[in-house]
């Protein structure tokens, strides 16, 4: 047979489109041409494939080889196409039987000696392969990742010769058994580590229960970072589908992640906009996507470049980020929970009782203006974190651990899911009218607050959402005036 077709997958955002590798062998001067919008790593595969075929004991044809990667308008990058290209050549030259690979897809980079090397995006590719009802052949190092999918046939090999022996019926490769991933629910941080700070701890619990964004403000050393790092430990565990969704993102990004834990990302304040939202010629996920279904913590918020912070405004509302390129748009999920921390002034000690702050009123104003009003308006809870007194630090009275707080958060979660099918932070204005019914006292209270604090419509709705969460934590169907009062206290003077 002089023509062969092999199936593989590309990566486009979080999708894995099907790619057909067509190999044609014809008479002519020995050459190997790859067409179909192949990028550098794919074009270089011709040398790896030639050496791998020869070193695996097969013949590399001394004829004209044309390899077409279809569809032609889809960019192909990475070295995962090495294995399908090599197998296509072997089938087209009659060294492997025809049609035995029809219900298979192949990914894998080839070493010069024929060994298979691991590739990125395995889980995303495996999920697409499963939907297509195909089997998957891949490098041994990627087997456990792909085998997380139930009822999916995965074949793993160390060497090109091993793959060929499987299809020659010389030595069959066993199906990799489905891996029941051990969910790592043990967090190294616990809220019991935090001394004092009852009000900030309460705000953290409310944020966890309703999925709300939160801003901690206070001088250095008061526990802002400590509190933020405890948030994942009080959040409900991811369900199996969410686990796979998060794992596929980290697979594409080629980044380590503890399976079963909610992501916690804390980029440095020198991070660029591309590092935060993602990008590149073939766009890759940024920090907000890596924090999907988890927590994005921005410490020293005013130290971030203002343009970098402004890119957060759209994904905070839409829960996704769209990256546009000349030929296409890539959409990445960005359903993260924003937790931020900041000092009140450049030195950090403004409004402190010990009068250490030497910053002028103008410098304090300039420092705080680095964060735009529209961004602050999108943060649900604003909370001051005061310095701890000596007796609070020395207090040995046991405080609530994360497991205890998480029980209350889980209960509030269930109330919300049963009532409206989602968390309170995502309630639309129409849903607010249905699920947030205020009595006469509360209505007067919110009207007065709107006038005094000059609340925007967005801030008004966010206060109602927070009050709904506080009521859910109290297991109350109706929102009481005490719930609304507490929600207003977390709004501060920013609106």
Feature annotation, model-predicted:
Residues 1-215, 219-225, 324, 460, ...:
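Peripheral, non-AAA+ core regions of ATP-driven protein-machinery
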Residues 41-46, 61, 68-78, 283, ...:
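Basic, amphipathic alpha-helical bundle interface domains used for macromolecular binding and assembly
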Residues 60-63, 100-101, 131, 150, ...:
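Short loop/turn elements that form and flank the Walker-type P-loop nucleotide-binding site
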Residues 112, 296-297, 303-304:
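Residues immediately C-terminal
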Residues 169-206, 210, 238-288:
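P-loop NTPase nucleotide-binding/switch module
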Residues 215-256, 318:
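Walker A/P-loop
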Residues 218, 278, 300:
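The Walker A (P-loop) glycine that initiates the GxxxxGKT/S ATP-binding motif of P-loop NTPases
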Residues 293, 299-300, 311:
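Walker B catalytic acidic pair
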